[in-house]
Amino acid sequence: MKIFDYEDIQLIPNKCIVESRSECDTTIQFGPKKFKLPVVPANMQTVMNEKLAKWFAENDYFYIMHRFDEEARIPFIKHMQNSGLFASISVGVKKAEFDFIEKLAQEKLIPEYITIDIAHGHSDSVINMIKHIKTHIPDSFVIAGNVGTPEGVRELENAGADATKVGIGPGRVCITKIKTGFGTGGWQLAALNICSKAARKPLIADGGIRTHGDIAKSIRFGASMVMIGSLFAAHEESPGETVELDGKQYKEYFGSASEFQKGEHKNVEGKKMFVEHKGSLMDTLKEMQQDLQSSISYAGGKDLKSLRTVDYVIVRNSIFNGDRD
């Protein structure tokens, strides 16, 4: 098995067939809807909130609302659907969450997307939740995770998941690999690659994205959608406190299993950091799209499919050659 991560890989260009990168199509059909980009902000409190979720839906971008304000979920679904927008929510696997799914069914509230969101998704509890959702609200598109193995992908798909999230602790504010010794940190792209060999349904690459080029690499190695946390954090529109440090503006960014999210120091697998203020989120999305269009042009195609078949070389952490200094 080849082991590598994003910084170890360089994709090899093919002959360009477009006059301009603007001809390249970055749209993706994911579940019942088509989106402008194959990216989704991480469903974290310092990355996504209701206001941003509405803006993303209005502008044909995918989003997943976090699950850390449980009482707000039903009003959120109603508000989004009454506004003619899609509802995309997260659930956990505790007993109350099973009751919540039944309540949605009773009220005939059908979110277009439901993400089962726990750190170790290859588990009986997630499999039971997938089956529970598919029994009570079968029309919802179910995303389950997170996993890091082909066996995990197969089991969640067999249980009824419509898509699977791949990634155990590779994110900047996730310390699972340090606290537990387990995870895909340092080999996330290889984990995605081996999981894609088993997948029959879409995969979401979750974690470890440091540059826009990593989006193209994720698609090459099997992702349909790419979940991004730190690159989407710390914008003008982002949730989170703004602080000034040494004359520069920063915003807080913390992991979903951090004590800052949990409100207690118990089973902590996330940390908090401050990310330098990045300006407008709209500008970042525009740049992300342009960079992905350039990736498609280098791949010798006109749409995302062309990225899936390009050749690559493994260069072992050398592609930056001091560019980060």
UniProtKB/Swiss-Prot annotation:
Q: Pfam families attached here?
A: IMPDH
Q: Which family does it belong to?
A: Belongs to the IMPDH/GMPR family. GuaC type 2 subfamily.
> So where does NADP(+) get bound?
203-226
Please give the function described in this protein's UniProt entry: Catalyzes the irreversible NADPH-dependent deamination of GMP to IMP. It functions in the conversion of nucleobase, nucleoside and nucleotide derivatives of G to A nucleotides, and in maintaining the intracellular balance of A and G nucleotides.
Q: What are the GO BP annotations of this UniProt entry?
A: purine nucleotide metabolic process
* Catalytically driven reaction(s): IMP + NH4(+) + NADP(+) = GMP + NADPH + 2 H(+)
**Documented EC number(s):** 1.7.1.7
Enumerate the active-site residues: 174
Keyword rRNA-binding annotated: no
Q: Can you cite an annotated GO cellular component?
A: cytosol
Q: Which HAMAP family match?
A: GMP_reduct_type2 (MF_01511)
Instruction: Select a single GO molecular function from the record's annotations and give it.
Output: GMP reductase activity
Q: What organism does the UniProt record list as the source?
A: Staphylococcus aureus (strain Newman)
Tell me where on the tree of life, at the top rank, the source sits: Bacteria
- According to its UniProt record, this protein's enzyme class is oxidoreductase
SUPFAM superfamilies linked to this entry: Inosine monophosphate dehydrogenase (IMPDH) (SSF51412)
State the UniProt keywords alphabetically. NADP, Oxidoreductase
This chain belongs to which protein, by name? GMP reductase
